[in-house]
Amino acid sequence: MHSISIVGRRYALALMEVAVDQNIVGQVMADFELIEQTMVEAKQLRLAIQSPLIQAYKKAALLKEVFGGKVSQQVATFLFLLASKNRAEYLPEVIQEYRALLDEQNGVISVDIKTAVDLDDKQTKQLKDKLEAYTSKKVRVHLATDKQLIGGLTIQIGDTVLDGSIRHQLAMLKNNLAAGALN
């Protein structure tokens, strides 16, 4: 695990423990989604939080100004703690790790699917249903289009990649021809 992920996971685990004790797991995730959305929309905020040149107390004040009254007291306190420990730049990783912990708790897995062409809603639902049957878990699908696949798709579930793309098939054919395995 990358050191950034280790820091993010450590803080996410601590917050999850508090959230479970106080029965606010869902509220914390809702607050994190608001924070995530705000940071996507407010580039200056994101840059300030990530900047090593801005002092920790200024980051704490900035987070309090932006999110005070908009998030639960527990999340506001957590943001202050993160900033005061000079760890505010890890906030995106903390959110990502918290979401992963929540998904794990709820039996949900994230699946990244790349296709050569856009899938319609019916195709996406069929694929999601098949993946849920295959994994015996609820699936959160993240779709992306990659024209370089030529055709077919790739599916990533955790560290496992299922590659059914034409690009992959052509690469395998090329390797087999080069190795003289084709008679």
Swiss-Prot record:
<dbReference type="GO" id="GO:0046933">
    <property type="term" value="F:proton-transporting ATP synthase activity, rotational mechanism"/>
</dbReference>
<keyword id="KW-0813">Transport</keyword>
<dbReference type="GO" id="GO:0045259">
    <property type="term" value="C:proton-transporting ATP synthase complex"/>
</dbReference>
<dbReference type="InterPro" id="IPR000711">
    <property type="entry name" value="ATPase_OSCP/dsu"/>
</dbReference>
<comment type="subunit">
    <text>F-type ATPases have 2 components, F(1) - the catalytic core - and F(0) - the membrane proton channel. F(1) has five subunits: alpha(3), beta(3), gamma(1), delta(1), epsilon(1). F(0) has three main subunits: a(1), b(2) and c(10-14). The alpha and beta chains form an alternating ring which encloses part of the gamma chain. F(1) is attached to F(0) by a central stalk formed by the gamma and epsilon chains, while a peripheral stalk is formed by the delta and b chains.</text>
</comment>
<keyword id="KW-0066">ATP synthesis</keyword>
<keyword id="KW-1003">Cell membrane</keyword>
<dbReference type="InterPro" id="IPR020781">
    <property type="entry name" value="ATPase_OSCP/d_CS"/>
</dbReference>
<comment type="similarity">
    <text>Belongs to the ATPase delta chain family.</text>
</comment>
<keyword id="KW-0375">Hydrogen ion transport</keyword>
<keyword id="KW-0139">CF(1)</keyword>
<protein>
    <recommendedName>
        <fullName>ATP synthase subunit delta</fullName>
    </recommendedName>
</protein>
<keyword id="KW-0997">Cell inner membrane</keyword>
<comment type="function">
    <text>This protein is part of the stalk that links CF(0) to CF(1). It either transmits conformational changes from CF(0) to CF(1) or is implicated in proton conduction.</text>
</comment>
<dbReference type="GO" id="GO:0005886">
    <property type="term" value="C:plasma membrane"/>
</dbReference>
<comment type="function">
    <text>F(1)F(0) ATP synthase produces ATP from ADP in the presence of a proton or sodium gradient. F-type ATPases consist of two structural domains, F(1) containing the extramembraneous catalytic core and F(0) containing the membrane proton channel, linked together by a central stalk and a peripheral stalk. During catalysis, ATP synthesis in the catalytic domain of F(1) is coupled via a rotary mechanism of the central stalk subunits to proton translocation.</text>
</comment>
<keyword id="KW-0406">Ion transport</keyword>
<keyword id="KW-0472">Membrane</keyword>
<dbReference type="InterPro" id="IPR026015">
    <property type="entry name" value="ATP_synth_OSCP/delta_N_sf"/>
</dbReference>
<dbReference type="Pfam" id="PF00213">
    <property type="entry name" value="OSCP"/>
</dbReference>
